Amino acid sequence: MATFKDACFHYRRLTALNRRLCNIGANSIWMPVPDAKIKGWCLECCQIADLTHCYGCSLPHVCKWCVQNRRCFLDNEPHLLKLQQLKHPITKDKLQCIIDLYNIIFPINDKVIRKFERMIKQRECRNQYKIEWYNHKLLPITLNAAAFKFDENNLYYVFGLYEKSVSDIYAPYRIVNFINEFDKLLLDHINFTRMSNLPIELRAITQEYFQLSRLPSSKLKQIYFSDFTKETVIFNTYTKTPGRSIYRNVTEFNWRDELELYTDLKNDKNKLIAAMMTSKYTRFYAHDNNFGRLKMTIFELGHHCQPNYVASNHPGNASDIQYCKWCNIKYFLSKIDWRIRDMYNLLMEFIKDCYKSNVNVGHCSSVENIYPLIKRLIWSLFTNHMDQTIEEVFNHMSPVSVEGTNVIMLILGLNISLYNEIKRTLNVDSIPMVLNLNEFSSIVKSISSKWYNVDELDKLPMSIKSTEELIEMKNSGTLTEEFELLISNSEDDNE
């Protein structure tokens, strides 16, 4: 199962390029790191191990040994993991580049075999050869790859020798096989040519090769926000916005496309060595404003929200209530995006004003039938069930029929923020005292989408961007969000 790891250990002594490419963490000293309790293939050493999150993409795809090298397949440094990575769409020319890569880095010929035999004979307690001593020379070329599906057109494939099997239900990738996209007979011929140089007793690799090269492809898994680790998330207490640390190996050398990189691998190895020698481990601080985080935060908000506020007599915002056991939610909102906090305040204030204008209620300790609906309303924000839930909330406010249209009253005083929001939404000069269902629904939707345009939000964090994209966004100033001018300097807001 450690064929690829053993090959990296022995082949790194062949050339100067191999000394840099084949230096993987699995052949180094182990350092303790937290794991994600996910079993799968480490993409760097191709072993089945407990995976931990990568500092480059925040996804669990490296083992506890290889993570110390801080390499990601999204780097632009041409290390081995980067060279094994191809982006969708996959063509036959790209697959040929993978085959050329293995033939260059892990050659099997008479010269290499004699060199390894001399190295083995120099060791102690080697009275007879055993097949496992040659494990590093039994590396077949397969076209199996770990596929990362960020969306329909954004897929990455990391090729490697993935031996054995493991339940990868929680891993962010799936193993796919591109042998049909290449040529089965041609790939067999390439491997048989490599095997012909091996001693007769070692040619049993043929059976292992066929088992690995004919693996069926798994169904691709769509990556969601929950697959990304929380370890790289940083909450900015000044701007009150979440961000994410992204670490990448950055080199000043550039290649127009993947094919040009492999051309330099064959014809200009010194360029790759220079790129790896001059690369810098760079930290990018990016905002974490995406649809996945928005849905997660909305779910947590619905879990922690206190619907009793709509029946209360508190004059302040819902997020500022501290000493009421039925309405206090400040413990949760202290470290949450300020946009979610503002949305929660406006939404709860609006429902409170509408509810108390139409229903005879006591105070926040009252038990009202509308309470479960308010939680459902928050959970349904930005979903297809939003209209249905809004209508149910509206019907719980004792609407009356006027000329065949159900309406509710809005007669309580409004704070300035909600007053301006309703005027802007309804496009009126003065706030109406009567609201129908369409107007009520428009106001709720306007409040929820005040700070979030779902159509323009990325579905996943910025850590899935390539290094070139991160550099370009950093230079253009779009990598982070700045809201200092929108944040109050009052002591209460900065608690």
From Swiss-Prot:
Protein name: Non-structural protein 1
Organism per entry: Rotavirus A (strain RVA/SA11-Patton/G3P[X])
GO CC annotations, alphabetized: host cell cytoplasm; host cytoskeleton
Disulfide cysteine pairs (residue numbers): none
Complex formation: Interacts (via C-terminus) with host IRF3; this interaction leads to IRF3 degradation. Interacts with host IRF7; this interaction leads to IRF7 degradation. Interacts with host CUL1 and CUL3.
Keyword hit for Hydrolase: no
GO molecular function: metal ion binding; RNA binding
Compartment(s) of residence: Host cytoplasm, Host cytoskeleton
Region called Interaction with host IRF3, residue ranges: 320-495
Task performed by this protein: Plays a role in the inhibition of host innate immunity by inducing the degradation of key host factors required to activate interferon production such as IRF3, IRF5 or IRF7. Associates with components of cullin RING ligases (CRLs) including CUL1 or CUL3, which are essential multisubunit ubiquitination complexes, to modulate their activities.
Name of one Pfam family that matches: Rota_NS53
Region Important for cytoskeleton localization, residue ranges: 82-177
Region (Zinc-binding domain): 42-79
